[in-house]
Amino acid sequence: MMELQGKFLIAMPHLDDYFNRTVVFMCEHNEQGSMGLVINQPTDLSIAELYSKLNFMMKNDRTFGNEMVVAGGPMHTERGFILHKNTLNAFQHTYKVTKELSMTTSADVVETLGSTFAPEKYLVALGCSSWGAGQLEKEIRDNAWLVVSSNDQILFDMPYEDRYAAANQLLGIHPYNFALAQVGHS
């Protein structure tokens, strides 16, 4: 079985549905299936707006940058998934993804965002991407996805619109090369 947990999946150019030009961070991969978060499709909702909509009691002043909530995938779009650097905080529903990263689905992590208690780095997603047992492996064999080790700079710091090209460049591929490969093929 391929080891995909903690890696990026890069959509091949022929995927023309929801996953066109996406990068997915794989949060879980085992015999039962796979789950990940699209990291380069921002919604129109900023994390600050999400925080105010959830109406948390603001005990401290909150500082938010320009981070947007991303559309993590077409499944469970009403549910929040926070991928973050590991922290000493004991959040209720946290799943350790790698030695350095965890995913939390409970509101207690959201309550810390913008405060000194927040994880050092985090990505907030609505929805997730999931595959049944063996489904993702088949898609990889069918050349729907490229697999590459993840990178914190791409995951947390890079502008959303640059993440697809940067993930491809981890493999030495420039997305422009994909466009050239399509010329003359119908």
UniProtKB/Swiss-Prot annotation:
GO terms for cellular component: cytosol. SUPFAM superfamilies: VC0467-like. InterPro entries: AlgH-like (IPR003774). It comes from the Bacteria. Belongs to the UPF0301 (AlgH) family. HAMAP family: UPF0301. This is UPF0301 protein HI_0304.
